[in-house]
Amino acid sequence: ENGLHRVDFIGFSCYSSADCISWKNEGLVLKASDQPGSPLHKSRVGERPKVLYNEKSRKYVMWFHLDSHDYMTAHTGVAVADRPTGPFQFVREMCPNRFDSRDMTLFKDTDGKAYLIYSSDWNKTLRIAQLTDDYLDVNGVYSHAFPEQEREAPAIFIKDGLYYMITSGCTGWEPNNALFGISHNIFSGWKLIGDPCTGENARQTYFGQSTYVFEKDGRHYLMLDHWNPSNLKESGYSILPVRADNGQLTVSFQEYTSL
């Protein structure tokens, strides 16, 4: 309708797996609303949910991109639950540190401090905002990375004291080549290095877009969104091995029977 690619927002689902190959659908953990005026109304956009466990509160905290149907609001949403399978209770809609926020991720550092990393300034700059101790808000301490470089879809991790951040270019639903950057300080000194992807379809990031890096059994893995703009509800994911060594980063596409 009107040339827009969208589906009604129904909420966020949770899937669980022991091997990242076979997945169990745990159902909707945060549901959209039919109530007019609700920040979670089905006519709005909810994307890229990320969940961290807070040891102090013993709560699971979700942050996500929350927007109007035309992507002009550019806010974040926050929700909290006792279990990763929910149900999550909506806490607030916000504009972190009074900046617009679109593609975003969460990162928990080795010291337990957590950060919201989000594309801002109409996708021209990535911002890095420290969260409060309970992870339910930003604490006012923030910085930026890659100003005027138009990077989005951040996925960040740390290895051997060095931060790595994988990002995407801004081409809407269409795939593009990824770039990664490194820094010894999460708030400053970020330097773009190059495309980490190798092999066939590397320049299109294997027709995906970075969304998160996680660690399992001492190895890092990159999760990609695979958008289907003609039928967004049929979009999927892939999980790929990441090799990080002394400031160099390599991602390869391969089939796995287990991780």
Placement of each model-derived feature along the sequence:
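Carbohydrate-active catalytic/glycan-binding domains of CAZyme proteins
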Residues: 1-259
